[in-house]
Regions:
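Transmembrane alpha-helical insertion/packing segments
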Residues: 5-83
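Membrane-helix interface/capping segments
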Residues: 77-95
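C-terminal halves and exits of single transmembrane alpha-helices
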Residues: 101-125
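Membrane-interface interhelical loops and short interface/amphipathic helices
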Residues: 122-162
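Individual transmembrane alpha-helix segments
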Residues: 155-178
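Short, charged juxtamembrane terminal tails flanking transmembrane helices
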Residues: 22-26, 191-198
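Alpha-helical transmembrane segments of multi-pass membrane proteins
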Residues: 31-35, 39, 95-107
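Alpha-helical transmembrane segments of multipass membrane proteins
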Residues: 39, 43-47, 71, 107-115, ...
Length: 198
């Protein structure tokens, strides 16, 4: 919760310092971002489920990649909806960027909880075992040996085996937040509009 408060405070500081958003507008921005973050989390959970299934089925692996590619477009569509319905068609770059950052933050929190629940109670070592088996296949082992990466791969597998479910979840949360910060820049620039809808 302290991390949540800190992240929201940083976003609030940057957008209110520029006099871009009043307190009620910031409250509205966070409310819309929470809802859209929950929807984004559903997409992330579906992507993760397809990834797990995709370890043994190429079709699900492909669907996982499609879901990852869809996330920035989904975020852009939801920002456009917020701009057109909540702000009457006008949004600044900074407000759009803050919206995307918060949406990925809230979505990342929900997804991290879901991933923690999966890794702690359902996985039972399946993920690491499947990755180990894939890397141990003769054709993959030969490529790893030719590249001189046998020690690095072995060390990486040991690190994966030593990771706790909370470590997986926190790593993913950090990745999602950083991804949201970076993806928010082009999305906010594209969706920026200074003229309200007529």
């Amino acid at each position: 919760m302290q991390e949540n408060a800190y992240f929201c405070t940083v976003i609030h500081y940057y957008i209110t310092k520029r006099k871009d958003v009043t307190a009620p507008e910031y409250k509205q921005l966070k409310a819309f971002a929470r809802v859209d973050g929950a929807l984004l989390a559903v997409l992330m959970i579906a992507c993760f489920a397809c990834y797990i299934a995709g370890l043994t089925s190429p079709l699900y692996g492909f669907l996982s990649i499609v879901a990852i590619v869809m996330m920035p477009f989904f975020a852009g569509i939801r920002l456009k909806r917020f701009r057109d319905t909540g702000l009457e068609g006008s949004i600044s770059f900074m407000r759009g960027w803050a919206y995307i950052c918060l949406m990925f933050f809230y979505g990342g929190l929900i997804f991290a909880l879901a991933q923690y629940a999966y890794m702690a109670y359902m996985d039972k070592g399946y993920l690491v075992m499947t990755i180990t088996n894939i890397l141990a296949l003769p054709e993959n082992a030969e490529v790893i040996k030719q590249l001189g990466m046998a020690d690095q791969v072995s060390e990486s597998i040991h690190m994966l085996q030593a990771m706790r479910p909370i470590d997986f979840a926190l790593n993913m949360l950090t990745t999602i937040i950083m991804g949201g910060i970076m993806l928010g820049l082009p999305i906010a620039a594209i969706m920026r509009r200074t003229r309200p809808l007529s």
